[in-house]
């Protein structure tokens, strides 16, 4: 292994004797933590140089400094520009003409970028000969000429064009002819593409493994071409309303390699077509039938031959007891079932299903409002290896049932109990699930600090906690979580009225915290947010809406320390022009919601918007639209910023119990 020379000028720095290969291995371990990599590069000149050589992936916020950045990182292979709202042709020309980048670039992400044209895409496709992965999703202005430009990338293997609504069969035909090596093509919501374009892709791109044509106006005509793809593994037909039973029957004549099939929201498919799936796809592992036909005994009988099926999604379907029982008697390899918002799920059918599928790892019962403790008893007795259980708004499940979850499902990593009757005793048992990483307890009005203290004492791996509108939680409970869960990344304490700055000061010890939602906490002030800003340097999302005591003094430390902040909601706070303008120094800031700020003036808002150069999305009160100069708005929109104007009337916040009663009434009406 090559070693660096040690010069007298370096005073025999021991780090210089370490080979590049060993240092590269160290950097590989640091890669998930960008701040650690940055700290590493600042240790010494040698490490700075090595980090530059090691980096393969770059995700800049702006394109202005790309020329100098490219000279520092000569070995880049993946460039993610999704955070750059404005990527003009001049930027793409710089990339494609770079002597170091053009031969090494293999992947570029333009999925949230705008302002490039066919000229820039053509330059990229022609000069970056090793380009294999391009994402231009959301390029709603791109037309066939842009697709034709991309078609010049002869080695392209993955192309994502979701929501490119102006592209037609002509553009996709160019892609099909030019990019013969494609293995993945995403055309979801490309409304101008029909049977002709999809058929051409299927005929010309024989190596396709993944094809997503969801919500395209295609019919059965293109199915015969699709079924002839010899290596197709993942086919997404969500929302293709013109594909019916005949089209599904045609699919069974080929696609022997198919592993994933999504026919959710395909309204023209009836129970008659489902047996085609069972007889044609022996290797199928993932099937999505959500928002489609009723799950009856006859339908499930058609799936009996899917012996390798592992994931089945039936979200939003009407299910019957006989259908659930039939599902229990087939598909023995199932490890994941989703019944979210399925009408008709009862104890009898669900209990039989889970008893027969004890190997389940993921179960989604969101809004299955008819199940009781009977179902929970069967789930916890049979599916002891569950890693994820979602049961939001299962309102007939009594508090005693949650004891069973904690007592029997020790391997849980994700648990969603939003809007349930769980109490402190239930949380005490849930704390036995020591591997839990995601815990959602929103609108759980029976829990208090006592239950949370059990979670804090026993669940050190917790990274996400949702306590939205759980009114019994106070500073003591949050402090317990902060002490016991040092790796916490996300917490939601919105509308927990008794939360004060003490909670935020405690949470400031969680150095990995990146998302804090404390809207509607009237006792929280700028002191607490200042503590968060000073310690939680990875903070990216902050919601302090309706925190009336939050003023400009909180914005100063945020501007100074929270340089990774990307999204902030300041609505209904006491922040003024001064505080808003101070946020201009946060170069990462992209999304801002500022409704009903009494101290905000039109001139102050204009200055702040102009100074915050990275903004891509701003929500504003409609009244400001006529106050801001039109040339200013045009300039900001040209910079890549989108404005969302709201005519929202100030609303008085309801008591948590009144709010839940109102929510239950709405659910009953639905």
Segments from the language model and where they lie:
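Structured C-terminal portions of repeat-based eukaryotic scaffold domains
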Residues: 509, 530, 538-541, 545-612
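Leucine-rich repeat domain C-terminal region
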Residues: 589-600, 610-670
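Conserved "Asn-ladder"/turn position within leucine-rich repeats
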Residues: 84, 113-114, 139-140, 164-165, ...
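N-terminal adaptor-interaction module of cullin-RING ubiquitin ligase components
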Residues: 1-180, 184-189, 194-215, 219-227, ...
């Amino acid at each position: 292994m090559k070693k660096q020379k040690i010069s007298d000028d370096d005073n025999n720095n021991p780090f210089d004797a370490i080979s590049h290969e060993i240092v590269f291995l160290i950097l590989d371990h640091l890669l998930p933590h960008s701040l650690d990599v940055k700290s590493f590069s600042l240790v010494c000149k040698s490490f700075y140089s090595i980090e530059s050589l090691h980096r393969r992936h770059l995700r800049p916020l702006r394109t202005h400094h790309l020329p100098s950045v490219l000279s520092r990182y000569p070995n880049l292979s993946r460039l993610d520009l999704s955070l750059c709202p404005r990527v003009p042709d001049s930027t793409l020309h710089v990339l494609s003409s770079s002597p170091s980048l053009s031969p090494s670039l293999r992947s570029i992400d333009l999925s949230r970028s705008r302002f490039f044209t066919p000229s820039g895409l053509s330059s990229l496709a022609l000069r970056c000969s090793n380009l294999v992965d391009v994402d231009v999703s959301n390029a709603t202005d791109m037309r066939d000429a842009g697709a034709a430009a991309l078609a010049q990338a002869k080695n392209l293997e993955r192309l994502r064009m979701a929501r490119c609504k102006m592209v037609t069969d002509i553009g996709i035909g160019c892609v099909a002819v030019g990019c013969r090596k494609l293995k993945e093509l995403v055309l979801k919501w490309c409304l101008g593409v029909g049977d002709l374009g999809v058929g051409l892709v299927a005929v010309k791109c024989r190596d396709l493994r993944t094809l997503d044509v969801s919500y395209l106006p295609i019919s059965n005509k293109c199915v015969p071409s699709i079924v002839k793809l010899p290596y197709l593994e993942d086919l997404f037909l969500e929302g293709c309303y013109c594909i019916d039973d005949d089209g599904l029957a045609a699919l069974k004549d080929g696609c022997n390699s198919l592993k994933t099939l999504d026919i959710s929201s395909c309204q023209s498919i009836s129970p008659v077509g489902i047996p085609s799936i069972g007889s044609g796809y022996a290797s199928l592992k993932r099937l999505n039938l959500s928002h489609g036909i009723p799950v009856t005994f006859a339908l499930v009988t058609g799936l009996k031959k899917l012996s390798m099926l592992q994931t089945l999604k039936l979200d939003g379907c009407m299910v019957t007891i006989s259908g659930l029982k039939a599902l229990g008697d087939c598909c023995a390899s199932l490890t994941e079932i989703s019944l979210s918002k399925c009408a008709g799920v009862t104890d009898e059918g669900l209990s039989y299903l889970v008893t027969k599928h004890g190997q389940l790892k993921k179960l989604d019962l969101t809004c299955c409002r008819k199940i009781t403790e009977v179902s929970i008893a069967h789930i916890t007795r049979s599916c002891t290896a569950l890693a994820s259980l979602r049961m939001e708004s299962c309102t007939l499940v009594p508090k005693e049932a949650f004891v069973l979850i904690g007592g029997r499902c020790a391997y849980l990593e994700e648990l969603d109990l939003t809007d349930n009757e769980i109490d402190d005793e239930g949380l005490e048992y849930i704390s036995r699930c020591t591997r839990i990483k995601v815990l959602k307890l929103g609108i759980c009005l029976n829990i208090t600090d006592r239950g949370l203290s059990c979670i804090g004492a026993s669940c050190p791996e917790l990274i996400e906690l949702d306590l939205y509108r759980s009114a019994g939680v106070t500073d003591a409970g949050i402090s317990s979580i902060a002490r016991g869960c040092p790796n916490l990344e996300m917490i939601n304490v919105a509308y927990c009225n008794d939360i004060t700055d003490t909670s935020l000061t405690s949470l400031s010890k969680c150095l990995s915290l990146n998302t804090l939602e404390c809207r509607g906490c009237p006792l929280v002030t700028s002191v607490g947010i200042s503590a968060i800003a000073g310690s939680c340097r990875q903070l990216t999302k902050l919601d302090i809406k309706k925190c009336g005591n939050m003023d400009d003094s909180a914005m100063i430390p945020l501007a100074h320390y929270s340089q990774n902040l990307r999204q902030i909601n300041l609505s209904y706070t006491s922040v003024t022009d001064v505080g808003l303008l101070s946020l201009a120094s946060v170069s990462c800031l992209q999304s801002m919601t500022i409704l009903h700020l009494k101290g905000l003036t039109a001139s102050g808002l204009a200055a702040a918007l102009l100074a915050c150069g990275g903004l891509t999305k701003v929500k504003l009160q409609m009244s400001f639209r006529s106050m801001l100069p039109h040339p200013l708005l045009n300039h900001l929109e040209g910079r890549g910023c989108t404005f969302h104007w709201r005519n929202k009337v100030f609303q008085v916040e309801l008591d948590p119990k009144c709010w839940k009663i109102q929510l239950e009434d709405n659910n009953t009406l639905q």
